[in-house]
Amino acid sequence: MNSNGDKLSLSVQNLANTNEITIVQAIGELKKSGKDAIPVLVEALKEEGSLCNIAAAVLGEFGEDASEAAEELSCLLKSHAEDTRMAAAISLMRIGKPSLPFVIKIAQESEGQSCFWASWCIAWIDPSCIEPKMYKCLKYEHEHPSGIVAPFAAEEALGKLIAFQLKDKED
């Protein structure tokens, strides 16, 4: 392991380790690497299970600096795994405006949970971009919960939309 890329790759692989000390050390190594870790983390999004989810979560911590990951993260909104969709959605929300083109496309072209989590992101990033289909999707999840977390997320997003509309009326 001589190159920085190899060290980063090993650190990312160690994120999925079951040993807490190894995970903490891996996070420390990634923090030292800063933005250089982003491409390696994006590559880890292609993995299955916890490594993908942890890589998604770590990317979100970079905020807008991880904008290059937005397209790949948005693809995870189509995952069959709820935890993967949620990890991707939270990271996309943290990346912010650079995520919008990708999440808007997913919300427009998808149904069900993919549309829901994309719409949730949009409500948090820029509520003015919410379209009627997206609003209906959020409302449907709130009224017909599909899981434990999604109805609360729907409630948050609907609250953001209501606050945006009220604020818009004041201006």
Swiss-Prot record:
Alphabetical GO biological process terms: bacteriocin biosynthetic process
Disruption phenotype: When the skfA-skfB-skfC-skfE-skfF-skfG-skfH operon is deleted, increased rate of spore formation; a double operon deletion (sdpA-sdpC plus skfA-skfH) makes spores even faster.
Keyword 4Fe-4S attributed: no
Function field: Required for production of the bacteriocin SkfA.
Protein name (Swiss-Prot/TrEMBL): Uncharacterized protein SkfG
Keywords assigned: Antibiotic biosynthesis, Bacteriocin biosynthesis
Induction data: By Spo0A and PhoP, during nutrient starvation, especially phosphate starvation. Repressed by AbrB during normal growth when nutrients are plentiful, in association with the transcriptional repressor Abh.
Keyword Metal-binding: no
Other observations noted: Accelerated cannibalism by skf- cells is seen on solid media but not in liquid media.
Gene coding for it: skfG
InterPro entries: ARM-like, ARM-type_fold
